[in-house]
């Protein structure tokens, strides 16, 4: 199933307008959630404040499972941002896809490998940055690439490439597969009679719920692996 997307060319480079739109929408939604949930904070949290505090505690638990809080506390906001961004991005294409003139405008941005691999590269780039910043270049390089044995250096380089590739493609594969199946189900529903269609709605709803679960799990996995890779770079014991 080949899809077409609106593009714009700038300086000889083609940009996917659908990705730009959906990433912007994702950022706006995450920003609104943060603003709404942190407005009028109370000593006894209720409702939306309970939700944002649960998210904060959840990410704190992820960090604490990989490194001590003294080291990992500075990545708390990063973890919250990644978790919420990836989750919202995963959800956008679940209820509907919008196409205009056979060009898809509305779908999950994480259903595009360019988006997920870019996220992975940014995350791995941050791990290297903080590793050098917190440990110094020499200590970081020796501890990361020459420990425990120097001859493992080529394998360590392969590992860096593999980590980046799998972090991005895992997220892409799960979200893309979910959207493809939902599209197939919706297409089949449009070509059958109303009585069979009513019955066919049931598996569609079940798959929607399953895709919601998968989207949440993938957001958790992406955040968890971010902190795992970060701990490998900034913690001496790794």
Curated annotation (Swiss-Prot):
Superkingdom to which the source organism belongs: Bacteria
Membrane topology, as annotated: Multi-pass membrane protein
GO molecular function terms attached to this record: proton-transporting ATP synthase activity, rotational mechanism
Record's keyword terms, sorted: ATP synthesis, Cell membrane, CF(0), Hydrogen ion transport, Ion transport, Membrane, Transmembrane, Transmembrane helix, Transport
GO cellular component: plasma membrane; proton-transporting ATP synthase complex
Subcellular location: Cell membrane
Membrane spanning residue stretches: 17-37, 75-95, 112-132, 172-192, 194-214
Keyword Membrane: yes
One BP term from GO: proton motive force-driven plasma membrane ATP synthesis
A Pfam short name: ATP-synt_A
Record note on quaternary structure: F-type ATPases have 2 components, CF(1) - the catalytic core - and CF(0) - the membrane proton channel. CF(1) has five subunits: alpha(3), beta(3), gamma(1), delta(1), epsilon(1). CF(0) has three main subunits: a(1), b(2) and c(9-12). The alpha and beta chains form an alternating ring which encloses part of the gamma chain. CF(1) is attached to CF(0) by a central stalk formed by the gamma and epsilon chains, while a peripheral stalk is formed by the delta and b chains.
UniProt xrefs under HAMAP family: ATP_synth_a_bact
Role: Key component of the proton channel; it plays a direct role in the translocation of protons across the membrane.
NCBIfam families linked to this entry: ATP_synt_6_or_A (TIGR01131), PRK05815.1-4 (NF004479)
Family indicated by similarity: Belongs to the ATPase A chain family.
Name of the molecule in the record: ATP synthase subunit a
Species of provenance: Listeria monocytogenes serovar 1/2a (strain ATCC BAA-679 / EGD-e)
Lineage of the organism: Bacteria, Bacillati, Bacillota, Bacilli, Bacillales
